[in-house]
């Protein structure tokens, strides 16, 4: 069983990610990052990318801006025959400080929880290949 399996992804949000004035990044971008987390979990558990079926809940808790460094985590909390329930979090760890100078940034200690969600992904039984795809 893979309950408790956690994966992590870190990245910097770029100016291209900004969707609103003031370099604000839309919350949907966080959901896109969660999609990558879920895909990695599916490959690790079943050797297949599977399909993200949907969210049971999503909470947008803090804004994200271009230049922020974020860390996304996903943990499998329940394993069904073909479905897996995942707890997802997106944390802001570094934030630019252009008010100080053009290249200043702050390490956020503690990090700021930006988005929290729970969702389910499904891997068809006939697509199960074992952990990491090593079954076939």
Which residue stretches match the model-derived regions?
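Hot-dog-fold acyl-thioester-processing enzymes
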Residues: 1-51, 109-136
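Small beta-barrel nucleic-acid-binding modules, principally OB-folds
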Residues: 47-68
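HotDog/MaoC-like acyl-thioester-processing domains
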Residues: 65-66, 76-136
């Amino acid at each position: 069983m893979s309950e408790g399996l956690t994966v992590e992804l870190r990245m910097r949000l770029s100016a291209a990610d900004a969707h609103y004035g003031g370099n604000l990044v839309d919350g949907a971008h966080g959901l896109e990052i969660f999609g990558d987390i879920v895909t990695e979990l599916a490959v690790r558990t079943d050797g297949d990318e599977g399909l993200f079926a949907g969210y049971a809940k999503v909470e947008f808790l803090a804004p994200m801006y271009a230049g922020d460094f974020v860390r996304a985590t996903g943990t499998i909390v329940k394993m069904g025959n073909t479905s897996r329930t995942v707890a997802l979090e997106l944390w802001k760890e570094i934030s630019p400080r252009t008010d100080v100078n053009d290249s200043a940034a702050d390490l956020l200690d503690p990090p700021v929880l930006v988005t929290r969600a729970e969702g389910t992904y499904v891997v068809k039984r006939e697509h199960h290949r074992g952990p990491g795809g090593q079954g076939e």
